[in-house]
Each structure stands twice: as C-alpha cells, then as structure tokens.
C-alpha cells in the first residue's frame, strides 16, 4: 500500500502535536506517525508546573492528550506506527512504516529523545524487573521498599521526589559532588526526609539477574576508589536522554552526540525536511520550547508548500 501526503510528522510529543495542530489548521492534512513512545517524554512525567497557561500546573499525560485532541479537531491524522526506513534523496520523500509506504512532500522530524541507560553488564537483563527509566510507570511496584535513583539533574530530582510516595527510602546517587538540577528542584529533594544523597559515587553493576529481580548494586566511590555492595529493590535512572535520530544517519547532519543539526531554527540540510523538539535541541529541552519549535517547523512547511506546491 502506498499514499502521498503534503506533510508527515514523525513523533507525537509536544513538538509533533504542535506541528500537527498548525499544519492541520493550514489545511495540509498532516499524518502523524506516533512512534515507539506516543506522547513523548511528557507522557512519562507527573505535574508540569512550567508550561504557561496552567497556574496550578497540569499532569504531563493530560497536557499531551489535550494537544493531540486539539490537533485532531482540525483534521490531523494519527497513526500507531513507527518509521523503519527513509529516503530523503528526492522529493516526494519516501518513508517506510513497516510494510506500508508513504510519500510526502515535506517531513517534520519530531522524534524526540529517549532515556539514557548506564550500560552496566546486567542492566538490560533486569529492565522490567527492578531497573527502570520511568518512575511514573514503575514506582508503584516498590511500595514500602528501599530504592535508588541515579543522576544529578532535574529528572533525577523529580523522580526521587515522586518515588517517595511509594518507597520507604530513596537514595539518590550522583557521580559528582555538585548538581546540575535547578535550585528549586534540588532543594525540594534535599528537604524531603525520605531522600538520602550519595555523591561522588558511580554504579558498576546491578544484582541479581539470576533471581530476575534487583537485590543490590555494586558501587564505587570515585574519590576513595572504595568498591562495595549496596542493597536496593530497584534502580531508577534519571540520567538524561539520547536523541532519536539514528534512522537519518548519512542523510541529515548530526552533532557529536547524535542531535540533528538545524540552521534558521528548524531547517535541516535537506530542503523540505525540518526538525524540531528534543531531537535537535540539546540546550533548552523544555516542553514549551519543543512546542515552539514544532510551530516553527509547521510554518516553514506552509511556506514551502506555498512556494513549491505538490
Ligand atoms: P540532564 O540535565 O542532562 O542531567 C543528567 C544527569 O545525569 C546529570 O547530572 C549527569 O551527570 C548524569 N549522568 C549522565 N550520564 C551519566 C552516566 N553515564 N552515569 C552517571 N550519571 C550520568 O538531564 P535531565 O535531568 O533529564 O534534564 C534534561 C532537561 O529537562 C533539563 O533542561 C531539565 O531542566 C529539563 N527537565 C525539567 C523538569 C521540570 O522542570 N519539571 C523535569 C525534568 C527535566 P553530570 O551532572 O555529572 O553530567
């Protein structure tokens, strides 16, 4: 099966939904490919307090759901699929969504970023068995247990604070002595009596894959070199994200960490292909900036379609 579109949007987080809303209102009938993590990072978060327009805050999943409904109201079409290959060498661009082929005059890449893992020898074997990158998804399973959160940024503070709802004790382990988290989120975590901080410490491995559950960690103090075991029932990672851009390798420019390179805000090196949100933004990475760049990409698509037609 094959079809031809004015615009396809890859990703359904803040940037993708906003691009969908704007291109739908421009009557371009966008197709949104939802991807592996529908709703993006906001769907895995709790209360969002810094998205303007919600004085009491709004739950992340609710915010993205609202955005989607708003885009759908103007005719955006959402498809549960993911991009398996892409050819940007000529227009219309060719996308494969599994066995399904889509040609499109323009492409908006809003594929976001996914959780980073530590790369421990037994980490992958224990995902879903006590190793997690999503406190909101998995916190509930550790009611009354002692757990560990890794990281020193806002994600780690947010996860640690959230997990105190369930856990009897949360140990936040960070590889340095200072934190990159915002002052307000760090202070909130520091004031929480259930959160204990372990700094200058790295995780070397997680036990015990033979039991199919997390029983403890092998830790190393980077200052003293001491290596020791630390009992815990869960390991939550809050160590940032990696951009979902591998599929465009060789066709679009990337920086050293794999973020798509853009000029004039959202233009890639291929005319008619735009990138927005966390897949191209290593600096701001906020819901509101992702939404803003989704709007920019949509306006560029409108201009492109006016100039080049179908
Ligand atoms: P981040 O700011 O990049 O922080 C990642 C943390 O993980 C850093 O402390 C880093 O340590 C640590 N880390 C990275 N790789 C590691 C490794 N291999 N081993 C051990 N530690 C490692 O990422 P983020 O916390 O996800 O935040 C990303 C952006 O989203 C930020 O702009 C943040 O403000 C925003 N955010 C906002 C909210 C909110 O406002 N509600 C919530 C979450 C995130 P180093 O410090 O040593 O590099």
Map each language-model feature to its residues.
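Phosphate-coordination loops involved in phosphoryl transfer and adenosine-cofactor binding
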Residues: 4-6, 80, 143-145, 200, ...
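Beta1-alpha1 glycine-rich phosphate/pyrophosphate-binding loop at the start
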Residues: 5-74, 145-146, 157-183, 255
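Residue-level detector of alpha-helix initiation sites
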Residues: 13-14, 37, 113-115, 154-155, ...
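A Rossmann-like FAD-binding core segment of flavoenzymes
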Residues: 71-90, 95-97, 101-103, 165-263, ...
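Glycine/small-residue-rich loop that forms an oxyanion/phosphate-binding "nest" at active or ligand-binding sites
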Residues: 78-140
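FAD-site-proximal beta/loop scaffold in flavoenzymes
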Residues: 119, 125-141, 238-289, 293-296, ...
């Amino acid at each position: 099966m094959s079809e031809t579109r004015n615009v396809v949007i890859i990703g359904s987080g803040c940037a993708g939904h906003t691009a969908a809303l704007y291109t739908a209102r421009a009557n371009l009938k966008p197709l949104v490919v939802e991807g592996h993590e529908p709703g993006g990072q906001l769907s895995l978060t709790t209360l969002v307090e810094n998205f303007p327009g919600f004085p009491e805050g709004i739950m992340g999943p609710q915010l993205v759901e609202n955005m989607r409904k708003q885009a759908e109201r103007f005719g955006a079409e959402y498809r549960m699929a993911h991009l398996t290959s892409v050819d940007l060498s000529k227009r219309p661009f060719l996308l494969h969504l599994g066995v399904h082929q889509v040609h499109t005059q323009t492409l908006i890449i809003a594929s976001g970023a996914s959780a980073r893992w530590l790369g421990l020898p037994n980490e992958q074997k224990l995902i879903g068995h006590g190793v997690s990158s999503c406190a909101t998804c998995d916190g509930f399973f550790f009611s009354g247990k002692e757990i560990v959160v890794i990281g020193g940024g806002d994600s780690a503070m947010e996860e640690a604070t959230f997990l105190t709802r369930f856990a009897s004790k949360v140990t936040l382990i960070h590889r340095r002595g200072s934190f990159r988290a915002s002052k307000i989120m760090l202070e909130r975590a520091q004031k929480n009596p259930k959160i204990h901080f372990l700094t200058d410490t790295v995780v070397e491995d997680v036990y015990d894959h033979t039991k199919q559950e997390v029983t403890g960690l092998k830790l190393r103090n980077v200052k003293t070199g001491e290596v020791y075991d630390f009992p815990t029932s869960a390991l939550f990672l809050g160590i940032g994200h990696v951009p979902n851009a591998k599929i465009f390798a060789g066709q679009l420019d990337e920086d050293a960490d794999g973020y798509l390179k853009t000029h004039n805000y959202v233009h890639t090196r291929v005319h008619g292909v735009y990138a927005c949100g966390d897949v191209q933004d290593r600096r701001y990475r906020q819901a509101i900036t992702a939404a803003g760049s989704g709007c920019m990409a949509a306006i560029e698509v409108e201009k492109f379609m006016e100039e080049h037609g179908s």
